[in-house]
């Protein structure tokens, strides 16, 4: 594009056009990339949501390694990247957690606490223990049936 004064419009199309779209997980199939791709951007306005989705789409999104300080409560409670406010403060003030403006929130925060990895593992342990109980109940039923047959043959 020329730097000539007043020449602000481009008169020709783009010289090199990409034939394939960029795939952020084509060569990087790590767990971190999968988590980033699956992340739900809630509590932000439409513009901030589009910005965050663009960052994810083109591998520019970097998750936080440790919590940041909230600009409202001044506690280290901001766990989402590129956000300036923690979830409780953003919910209470009904503002975007990323830009801080009173825009319409596209996807509001969930009221219930997020399920942690510990509760998930407890649930799977619960399923295992239930299955063990069922197996042991079946064993007990089989043993009681065989005892009943023994009594019939002895009498």
Curated annotation (Swiss-Prot):
Signal peptide: none annotated. It holds the Pfam family DUF2039. The modification Phosphoserine is found at residues 136, 144, 146. Keywords: Acetylation, Phosphoprotein. Disulfide bonds: none annotated. Residues 1-22, 108-155 are annotated as: Disordered. Residues 136-155 have a biased composition (Acidic residues). The modification N-acetylserine is found at residue 2. This is Uncharacterized protein C9orf85 homolog. It comes from Rattus norvegicus.
